[in-house]
Amino acid sequence: MTTDTIVAQATAPGRGGVGIIRISGDKATDVAMAVLGHLPKTRYADYCDFKNATGQVIDQGIALFFKGPNSFTGEDVLELQGHGGQIVLDMLIKRVLEVEGIRIAKPGEFSEQAFMNDKLDLTQAEAIADLIDATSEQAAKSALQSLQGEFSKEVHELVDQVTNLRLYVEAAIDFPDEEVDFLSDGKIANALYKIIDKLSTVQASAKQGSIIREGMKVVIAGRPNAGKSSLLNALAGKESAIVTEIAGTTRDVLREHIHLDGMPLHIIDTAGLRDTTDTVEQIGIERAWNEINSADRVLFMVDGTTTDAVDPHDIWPDFINRLPANLGVTVIRNKADLTGENLDMTEEKGYSVYRISAKTGLGVDELKLHLKSLMGYQSNLEGGFIARRRHLEALDVAASHLQLGKEQLEVYLAGELLAEELRMAQLALSEITGRFTSDDLLGKIFSSFCIGK
């Protein structure tokens, strides 16, 4: 861990009413004496002059001093809050750098110091960047929940449960004559099942949190001329795709990134799916399936003039059967302006079915509400925590090891192998909060932060 004293502008670059310079490290007191002529009282706002090396006043403002470890970074921290002109702030940083042993902070280094000094865990540190980058009230609320430790709490509980079960299993192994009895008495199995269930709940919440942060990838798929491109245009609010009566007009993947009440949505229009000998169209269809396989949701577009069916298994069983097992599907019966169908939503065998006219826009607003709901939008802002893709991957790894451990227990009564799978699950979960994390990962995470955070 670095022992350097670092300085950076904590407010956004440019012109503003107030500009803040932040200093963290052992030399913060030296900076106070050099720039202010005195050390401000801890946690008191001190209005004073900021002076250069010859004693001339650079600016006037508020100085705040926080004595470590009772500060954001866990070190001595000095904040100089002056006027927000960039020239003035640059002059002030230059003055601070004249004090021996001070250097400019790297992006995210203040938060990294807080993490290293156990003031934050890794999910809380990441939540700072997510709160700054939030594009909706829901994302901001969820990021704040993570910053306050809600996600960390769930992960710590899982780690503790896995660790305790692992210790119990290893204790059973220490008594080989009784190991089979320990493993078959149901106590270990019940504890393992409870952990798997809890992890599944956390995974679902994290998946929702990831969608709130990163957006939901929605693929519009169906047969040619079902109205996929018209729906893309209707959702995007502009003519993004060429629309004609000729089947197969769209031959490549088209993407639009929009926000629904601040919630990011990535919409992808794909080539119509059908058997074809056209080489270019075949490539487009292959790309369409690649997008479908990595989607968060599929909007299955159906030309309502060609069938009265609402169950997707009746409409196109081969398509539905080829979809990934856990991929959510919303059925869109298009061309309601021609069929005269009521513009309503129904549930059919577990599938949401919407009747719309992509051409006229009828029913599209209701579909947008549906998509917002899938992304976790809540008007009362009572949401969960925010999560990143790396969190989902770590949870998936942990879940995989727990399932393997379950197999070792149920099929083979193999205590040593179960203990090893529990250990691997524990490591995967601990990576989320940074308890066991490589330096390379830490560098990648904090380098994406703003300078001054």
From Swiss-Prot:
(6S)-5-formyl-5,6,7,8-tetrahydrofolate binds at R22, E79, K119, K453. The keyword Ribonucleoprotein does not apply. K(+) binds at N225, T244, I246, T249. GO terms for molecular function: GTP binding; GTPase activity; metal ion binding. CDD domains: trmE (cd04164), TrmE_N (cd14858). PANTHER family: TRNA MODIFICATION GTPASE GTPBP3, TRNA MODIFICATION GTPASE GTPBP3, MITOCHONDRIAL. Its EC number is 3.6.-.-. Exhibits a very high intrinsic GTPase hydrolysis rate. Involved in the addition of a carboxymethylaminomethyl (cmnm) group at the wobble position (U34) of certain tRNAs, forming tRNA-cmnm(5)s(2)U34. GTP binds at residues 225-230, 244-250, 269-272, 334-337. Its cofactor is K(+). The keyword tRNA processing applies. The gene is mnmE. Residues 215-376 form the TrmE-type G domain. This is tRNA modification GTPase MnmE. Mg(2+) binds at S229, T250. InterPro entries: G_TrmE, GTP-bd, GTP-bd_TrmE_N, GTPase_MnmE, MnmE_dom2, MnmE_helical, P-loop_NTPase, Small_GTP-bd. Keywords: Cytoplasm, GTP-binding, Hydrolase, Magnesium, Metal-binding, Nucleotide-binding, Potassium, tRNA processing. PROSITE patterns: G_TRME. One of its GO terms (cellular component) is cytosol. Homodimer. Heterotetramer of two MnmE and two MnmG subunits. It comes from the Bacteria. It is found in: Cytoplasm. GO terms for biological process: tRNA methylation; tRNA wobble uridine modification. Belongs to the TRAFAC class TrmE-Era-EngA-EngB-Septin-like GTPase superfamily. TrmE GTPase family. Binds 1 potassium ion per subunit.
